[in-house]
Design a protein with these regions (language model features):
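Multi-pass alpha-helical transmembrane bundle typical of ion/small-solute transporters
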Residues: 1-305
Length: 305
């Protein structure tokens, strides 16, 4: 497993903290963010992630940059599945749009912390026991089968929200921006707080798929975490952009299933079959592109009827 110089980690940490500060500053206040502004920020986040690939290329070489791009594309593609979950959580709890931004901010920052824990633990396990890679492969193949069979767009209620609501007293006011309130002398969690918990728990479940998928293209801890971080940072803006029609992307889950299956087969057969990072990038782009194009075609066709 390749060791990354400490100064590169320090540079990444400095850039990451700076980007988080910019994100918080640019979205401060309780105003509802326009779709056009969110499109701008989505493009900006993607451009930043790609610019970091150029930095990696200049410091660590082309092969490392290709691995970073492959891991970034995997995380970015699979995060589209997260959008379905975000939408269902907010619909279940009836969270207004201005509060959704707050929930997404907490959810994304929490995801950065949890992903770090999972990635470092996974890297340590792979380094110590070679057979862990095959477990990752099996997990990905089963996840692909599940993604193929179950369309998240058809889910009407969040199971995570239902589970939390049976264990915590919840207030009914979904417009409240506080996390807890007192009602008749009893402390209750607000729907906003429950939505944040649901987002965090959902991301933990998604990490079980996405992190092993990243290990299928690289085992360098720095490349996995940096690619995950840059892919995650733009999720809030991306959600605002596509929330209105994400539920209509009927073939998207087949693309997710194909990506998971590809990653699972790649990591399982890595001892006998070598697939370069740049080929992985091409495969992922084609799979997600085909699924998106098919979904948009079906959406346009149904609209013309």
């Amino acid at each position: 497993m390749t060791e990354t110089p400490q100064w590169i980690w320090d540079t990444f940490a400095f850039v990451l903290l700076g980007l988080i500060a910019i994100d918080l500053f640019s979205h401060r206040g309780g105003r509802e963010v326009s779709r056009g502004w969110s499109v701008f920020w989505s493009i900006a986040w993607i451009a930043t992630g790609l610019a970091f690939a150029v930095f990696i290329w200049s410091i660590l070489g082309r092969h490392a940059a290709d691995e970073y791009l492959a891991a970034y594309l995997i995380e970015k593609s699979l995060s589209l599945d997260n959008m379905f979950v975000f939408l269902i959580i907010f619909q279940t709890l009836k969270i207004p749009k201005k509060n959704q931004r707050t929930a997404l901010s907490w959810g994304i920052f929490g995801a950065l912390v949890f992903r770090a824990v999972f990635i470092f633990a996974g890297a340590a396990a792979v380094q110590r026991w070679d057979w862990v890679s095959y477990i990752f492969g099996v997990i990905l193949i089963f996840a692909a089968i599940h993604a193929f069979r179950e369309d998240p767009a058809e889910t009407k209620e969040s199971r995570v929200v239902h589970w939390l609501s049976t264990r915590l007293p919840i207030s009914r006011d979904s417009r409240d921006r506080r996390f807890f309130i007192k009602h008749w002398g009893k402390r209750k969690a607000t729907p906003l707080f429950i939505s944040i918990l649901a987002l965090e728990l959902s991301d933990v479940l998604f990490a079980v798929d996405s992190i092993p998928a990243a290990f299928s293209v690289t085992q360098t801890t720095f490349l996995i975490y940096s690619s995950n971080a840059f892919a995650i940072l733009g999720l809030r803006s991306l959600y605002i952009v596509i929330a209105e029609f994400i539920g209509e992307m009927r073939y998207l889950h087949y693309g997710m299933a194909a990506i998971l299956a590809f990653a699972g087969m790649k990591i399982t057969l890595s001892r006998w079959v070598h697939i370069s990072p740049i080929v992985s990038v091409a495969v992922i782009l084609n799979l997600i592109g085909a699924a998106t194009a098919a979904s948009m075609w079906a959406l346009k066709r149904s609209a013309n009827r």
